[in-house]
Amino acid sequence: MAERRVSNGEEVVINVSDKEDSKDPRASPSFNPLASPDSDAGIEKSKPVPPISIPTPEIYKFSGSVHKPPKIPSPEGLVRRKSLSRSIYSKPKSRFGEQQSFRYDSTREENGGRSLREQFGAGSFARGSFDRASPNNKSNRSVASAALSKVAEEEPDENEEIYKKVKLHRVKRSGMKPLAFLELVVFMAILGALIVSLTIDVVNKHTIWGLEFWKWCVLVMVTLSGMLVTNWFMHFVVFIIEKNYLLRKKVLYFVHGLKKNVQVFIWFSLVLIAWICLFDGDVKRTRKTKRFLDFITWTIVSLLVGSILFLVKTFALKVLASKFNVRNFFERIQESVFHQYVLQTLSGPPLIEEAENVGRVPSTGHLSFTRTKDGKVKDKKVIDMGKVHRMKQEKVSAWTMRVLIEAVGTSGISTISSTLDEVNNKKERTDKEITNEMEAVAAAYDVFNNVAKPNHNYIEEDDLLRFMIKEEVDLVLPLIEDADTGKITRKTFTEWVVNVYTSRKTIGHSLNDTKTAVKQLDKLITGILTVITFIVWMVLLDIASTKLLLVFSSQFLGLAFMIGSTCKNIFESFMFVFVMHPYDVGDRCVVDGVMLLVEEIDLLTTVFLKIDNEKVFYPNSVLISKPISNFYRSPDMGDYVDFGIAFSTPAEKIGCLKGKIGEYLVANSQHWYPEAQVMVRAIENMNKLVLNILVQHTINFQVYVEKSLRRTALIIAIKRILEDLEIDYTLLPQDVNLTGHK
């Protein structure tokens, strides 16, 4: 049994098996009151300052009950600060958006009847994203990856096709393109002339330049209509491959990429065969005519050799791009697709609850996404999330990876609730995808109200089980901060949705940069192969003799000496980007002791952002010889706090200090690992003990502001503990010499 809900183009599909007997997938949520300082349901709150993972202040102005929308700065109440140095025609200088300052006019009151999406959709609240570029919490990311791999280990991976196309509506063909129509007319005209020449004796015996008329018809047909016929042939081959599952899974990706090159190769081959067969070598011709025919023959051979070289080049680039994307982006794309599926599912009706009411056992759902081109919907695809969970990086096919890249790169994050708004307001734009962080906040508010119980400011595990099966809920909970308490607050859920949006945007930039780098490499190799094809043509025509080649080779050696460093830099840049690849777009790195954010990766250069949004351009040939620290790819990182106490402090108080710090870490286990190392680093002047406290975060330092806020809260807690234990430090008495002057 399958239930499908459609709302203006968005679709969520839930498969329900036919088994009648089932166990209740719901489980009582675990509850730990010490781990959630932000809960709104009477949970005991811990004193330390809670972490803030979204540093900009706009998001935290949202507050309100379930029935009343939070007070938000509507576009009418926002007044842009004047800037004398920025033109209205200037574009953002950073792909992550620039810092924009808004002033909220408190004299304006919000319209309570308008939805959040209506209020946010009118304006873009793009903000500086040095701390938001790659927001995925690494610990959460590792937990999710482990959970996905656990699911993959339970069932054998068959690397099945994970998608199927869904027809939105039957699209009538707009007609044949003018060039294709002209080619068809020429083909039919030549075919008619060929039939006439073969059936009428007078025309059949007629010769032009010593060659029968029908031979000229065949030669002209192969030359002018060869691409048309080979195009039909390639479409037939693709049709046969799509009907065969094994071929579709293994070679369809390369067939689509090589179709044009194979088509040109077959065309030149047919032209060469027709030319050699029609012009009989036994016929006596003048020397001038023979030289002309040889010139045409060797030119066609040179073009055929060039087509082979270009075919090999395209195949090599396709393999390189496929392997590169699988190695570097598979896990991130897999997680991003799952996040989008969660948002789509939670924004729709509780289909799992409805399936249980019928007495059926629900299964994993599907994620639907649409591909657009030039603002028009091209097609819709549906991804089976059960198969996505079972996929392994080592066995994923190139075609499957292409579908996943399309799901992330050519479509944005959208929710079912957004299409409901679109139905109510037809003047809204047709593309209702989340386009900025403020729209992500609005979407989070709508989804939260859709999932949470009435008059509740939190989401429990039972609420999620109304929309997803138990296995999927177990994958979702580790992704959201404070979910281990059993209750997800509005704030933490909003932060997670914003993280999902910024993560998707970062992956999109990474895929676009990879595509750009491959295109630049393609242009470089195309130029080299063009020169090689030209040299082959000259050699075949005896235009370039051995002596001439020696002269040219000596010139090339001199040129190579001049541009040798450039070639070396290009090769090193290629190795750095495609082989080493120490970072992706949005990763926070440390180069030469400076903390930088990767904004753009090119074949020859990488663009970084400093913490003050200053852009830094590094040649990749220089970066290849530098050690680079990558925070995003690092595991949960450690931190330390140094401070001094009096030498006379009793050892018992130092032990109490260690115990109090341990209690603080346990009470904030969502931020810190429970164990802390308190060590005496030095004794200074027999008066001061320098203590070093080593702690470990539950995140890496990708989101540096989050790390700094947690460290600040820890230092403030240590200060309070020192005050409670009356541990202090005073300087030794100092001799002061006073000299009087008359």
From Swiss-Prot:
Coiled coil: none annotated. The modification Phosphoserine is found at S28, S36, S142, S145. It comes from the Eukaryota. Belongs to the MscS (TC 1.A.23) family. Detected in the epidermis, cortex, and endodermis of the root tip. Residues 1-117 are annotated as: Disordered. The chain crosses the membrane at residues 180-200, 221-241, 261-281, 292-312, 524-544, 559-579. It is a multi-pass membrane protein. PANTHER family: MECHANOSENSITIVE ION CHANNEL PROTEIN 5 (PTHR31618), MECHANOSENSITIVE ION CHANNEL PROTEIN 9 (PTHR31618:SF17). Disulfide bonds: none annotated. Gene3D superfamilies: 2.30.30.60. Mechanosensitive channel that opens in response to stretch forces in the membrane lipid bilayer. Residues 17-26, 105-117 have a biased composition (Basic and acidic residues). Keywords: Cell membrane, Ion channel, Ion transport, Membrane, Phosphoprotein, Transmembrane, Transmembrane helix, Transport. SUPFAM superfamilies: Sm-like ribonucleoproteins (SSF50182). This is Mechanosensitive ion channel protein 9. It comes from Arabidopsis thaliana (Mouse-ear cress). One of its GO terms (molecular function) is mechanosensitive monoatomic ion channel activity. Its main location: membrane. One of its GO terms (cellular component) is plasma membrane. It is found in: Cell membrane. The keyword Aminoacyl-tRNA synthetase does not apply. The keyword Transit peptide does not apply. One of its GO terms (biological process) is detection of mechanical stimulus.
